[in-house]
Curated annotation (Swiss-Prot):
Stored Gene3D superfamilies: Coenzyme PQQ synthesis protein D (PqqD)
Protein name: PqqA binding protein
Keyword Nucleotide-binding part of the UniProt annotation: no
Species, as recorded: Rhodopseudomonas palustris (strain ATCC BAA-98 / CGA009)
Top-level taxon of origin: Bacteria
GO process annotations (BP): pyrroloquinoline quinone biosynthetic process
Length: 102
């Protein structure tokens, strides 16, 4: 089954789909997103955001954490985070965590 495409909002809980992994590549000495026949090399800020995309945190919590860490305007951080996450979702590198049955 193909991963569900999402429309990123502050309430969604993004996570990498099963076919993609965020991994530190020792050869390249940088973080990469590995997917079948594709490799993306995100920058440092994108890596920090992706590490927070664990399916437990919603986008609002990710934005709040980054705004607090960098003492930056939440609205500005929010626009950048939402744009990056939506771009990755549109390319199939992000999906939304689903509720698990108890």
């Amino acid at each position: 089954m193909a991963p569900r495409r999402i429309s990123v909002s502050e309430t969604c809980r993004p996570v990498l789909p099963r076919h993609a992994r965020l991994k530190f590549d020792d050869t390249r000495q940088r973080w990469v997103i590995l997917a079948p026949e594709r490799v993306l090399a995100p920058d440092e800020i994108a890596v920090e955001i992706l590490q927070l995309c664990d399916g437990a945190c919603d986008v609002a919590a990710i934005i709040d954490a980054l705004a607090a860490k960098y003492t930056a305007d939440r609205a500005e951080i929010g626009r950048d985070v939402m744009a990056m996450l939506q771009d990755l979702a549109d390319k199939g590198f992000l999906t939304e965590a689903r509720e698990t049955a108890p």
